[in-house]
Regions:
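Short glycine-rich phosphate-binding loop at a beta-alpha junction
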Residues: 46-56, 71-72, 199-208
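N-terminal phosphate-binding loop and adjacent alpha-helix
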Residues: 23-62, 176
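Glycine-rich phosphate-binding/hydrolytic loop that grips phosphoryl groups
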Residues: 95, 179, 223-243
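Adenine-nucleotide phosphate-binding core of ATP-dependent small-molecule kinases
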Residues: 30-32, 161-202, 209, 222-223
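Glycine/small-residue-rich loop that forms an oxyanion/phosphate-binding "nest" at active or ligand-binding sites
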Residues: 67-101
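Glycine-rich phosphate-binding loop plus the immediately following alpha-helix
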Residues: 92-97, 102-105, 128-176, 237
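Conserved phosphate-binding/catalytic loops in two-lobed NTP-binding clefts
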Residues: 68-80, 217-233
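Gly/Thr-rich phosphate-binding beta-strand-loop-beta motif of the actin/hexokinase/Hsp70
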Residues: 1-27, 107-126, 143
Length: 243
C-alpha cells in the first residue's frame, strides 16, 4: 500500500484528500473541502507523495515554492492521454478530468460544472479539444456589475428547463435567463461534440453544479461523475509515479 495526498485547487473551493493505493485501486482515507482563499498550507504533509491540480496561478506559484517535490497535473506529466494537440495553457483541472475519463473508457466527454463550465473531448485516448462557458455565478455577477439596477441573484440548482414559465419579477426573470443560458449552451455544445465520437461514448458530469445538468431531459445520456471525478484523475497520476 502507498499513501499520497491530492489537492484539487479550484477558483472558489479546494478539495484536499489523503489516498491509499493498493493494486492500482485507490481508497480515499480522508477528504476535506476548503475555501481556496483559506488553504491550510502549514497543515499539508511534507513527507507524503503529493499531486495537485490548480487553476489559480497564485496558488500554483505557492505550491511550486513551498512543495517543489509535489507533482502538478500537467500534460507533460500525464502519460495516459495524448495531449500533443493541446496548447501549453491547458488547465490542470481539464487534464485531470481527461485522465479520470480514460480510466473508464478510451474516449468520451467530461463536463465539469463549476465556476466555469468546461467540456473535454477525448477520442481514443487523445484530447481533441472542448469548450469553456461561464457558470451561473459568473453570469449573475456580470449582469449585476454591468447594469445600474439589476440585483445580484443566487441561481442555485437549475431544474428541468422545460418547467420554466414567464416571470414578472426582475430577479426571477434573471434567474431563469441565467440558468437557461448556462445549461442550454452546455447541452448545445454537447450535441455538437458527441458527433465526433463513436456511438455510445460516455458523457460524465462532475463539479459542484453538476445536478443542474443531470436534471435535464437530455438526448445524450449523462452519467453522474460524482464529487471526486477530478480527484480520480489525480489518483491516476499518483499511481503512475508511485509504481
Amino acid at each position: 500500500m502507498s499513501r499520497f495526498c491530492a489537492l484539487n485547487i479550484g477558483n472558489t473551493h479546494t478539495q484536499i484528500a489523503m489516498g491509499i493505493l493498493k493494486n492500482s485501486a485507490v481508497k480515499w482515507e480522508k477528504s476535506e473541502t476548503f475555501a481556496t482563499s483559506a488553504i491550510p498550507f502549514t497543515e499539508l504533509p511534507i513527507d507524503i507523495f503529493t499531486v495537485y491540480s490548480s487553476v489559480v496561478p497564485q496558488i500554483t506559484a505557492i505550491m511550486k515554492a513551498k512543495f517543489p517535490q509535489a507533482v502538478p497535473c500537467t500534460a507533460a506529466n500525464v502519460k495516459s492521454v495524448d495531449f500533443s494537440s493541446a496548447p501549453p495553457t491547458l488547465g490542470m483541472d481539464r487534464i485531470a478530468n481527461c485522465a479520470a475519463l480514460v480510466q473508464k473508457n478510451p474516449g468520451g466527454i467530461v463536463i465539469d460544472a463549476g465556476t466555469c463550465i468546461t467540456l473535454e473531448v477525448v477520442a481514443n485516448r487523445k484530447f481533441i479539444g472542448g469548450a469553456i462557458l461561464p457558470g451561473t455565478g459568473i453570469l449573475a455577477r456580470a449582469m449585476h456589475d454591468y447594469t445600474g439596477a439589476l440585483p445580484l441573484v443566487d441561481c442555485g440548482i437549475t431544474p428541468d428547463l422545460q418547467q420554466f414559465k414567464t416571470e414578472t419579477l426582475t430577479a426571477e426573470a434573471m434567474k431563469i435567463g441565467i440558468q437557461s443560458a448556462a445549461v442550454a449552451g452546455t447541452l448545445q455544445l454537447l450535441s455538437n461534440f458527441i458527433k465526433k465520437l463513436p456511438p455510445a461514448s460516455p458523457v460524465f458530469v462532475c463539479g459542484g453544479n453538476r445536478q443542474s445538468l443531470l436534471n435535464q431531459n437530455c438526448t445524450v445520456p449523462l452519467l453522474d461523475g460524482g464529487n471526486d471525478f477530478t480527484m480520480q484523475g489525480l489518483a491516476a497520476l499518483a499511481a503512475m509515479y508511485m509504481k
